Amino acid sequence: MTSRIRRREFLAGLGAGLGAGLFARPAIVRAEGPVVIRAGALKLIHSIAPYFYDQFVPAGYKIEVLPFETPTECKNAVVTKSVDFGAFGIAAAVLGAAAGEPVVVIASTCNRGMAIIAKKDAGIAAIKDLKGKRVAVFPGTTQEVFFLERLRMEGMTIKDVEPVRVSFSEMHIALSRGDIDAYVGAEPGPGVSLSSGVGTLVEYPYSTAMGSLNMVFGTHRDVITQKPELVRVMLGIHQRATDYAATNKDAMVAMASSKLGQKKEAIEASVPNVELTWKLEAKQIEQSKIYADHMLALKQIKRLPDFATFIDTSFVDAVKPT
């Protein structure tokens, strides 16, 4: 009798165990996908480093590069967290920070990359020759502030020229059509105008106290406080990609031709006027402050940014040379 009970209990227990095995939800081990980093870039040659990012992404991460037409659009994408990081002009960064937006500059992207170009045979050889001429200037950009300062240095103001609002990508075309007499542009536009013979160089506007400061690399303040490791990873990628592009001109030209849709000759004409860099040193910070002072004097901003929080060099300072 006892053996029957034990046998019955054993079979019942076995059935219960099988039932549990059949109906219980199995434990599924899911492999986590890579961490996706979204980076904004501009359709300009001095924003070409982001297109090399994917060559330097460490294991466990994936990079997505999103192109933007204007610096303000890229900066706004950072502010709204549409991207995690972005490359844009110092002007867009200062405008945002002065308005209280949580944008933080954590590295540099490029110096130089600007030029004042005139229509060939238009008799424009210097800034003073622009008086009364139609000059394309894109408002709210780094180039605009440099141009206004160069006018001031020559005893002129914006009222001495006829400013025409034209985006960087359209300036060469407008010059070719005769819609404008000159423009204050961003590479590769000037390189296209010079290599095609349509334009002539008036000057590279780097003689001001702002030097050749141009593009910076920024993120949202929340990314710094909540994801500092992500910032460190991104800075490592940015540093390696920037150094690679800066020291491999052929690769830089090929990438720019592919991504920007310009002829090799035009890109080659632009490269000498582009200084790719990730370093954010005391000189660049001082130039940024001078730049912000100019924007305040021009009433483009109502107050200066708080530079104690606007620029954070801690991540760049921690990057080890490769």
Stretches found by the model and what they are:
Residues T225-K302:
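Secondary-structure end/capping motifs
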Residues M1-L18:
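N-terminal secretory signal peptides and thylakoid transit peptides that target proteins
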Residues A91-A92, S169-S258:
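Pocket-lining segment of extracytoplasmic ligand-binding domains
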Residues A20-F23:
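Hydrophobic h-region of N-terminal signal peptides that target proteins for export
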Residues E32-T157, E162-F168, D181-P188, V198-Y204, ...:
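Short, glycine-/small- and polar/acidic-enriched structural segments
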Residues R25-R30:
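Sec/Tat signal peptide C-region and signal peptidase I cleavage site
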Residues N76, T80, V94, K128, ...:
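Solvent-exposed, polar/charged alpha-helical surfaces in well-ordered, non-transmembrane soluble domains
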Residues L296-T322:
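Conserved C-terminal helix/tail region of periplasmic/extracytoplasmic solute-binding proteins
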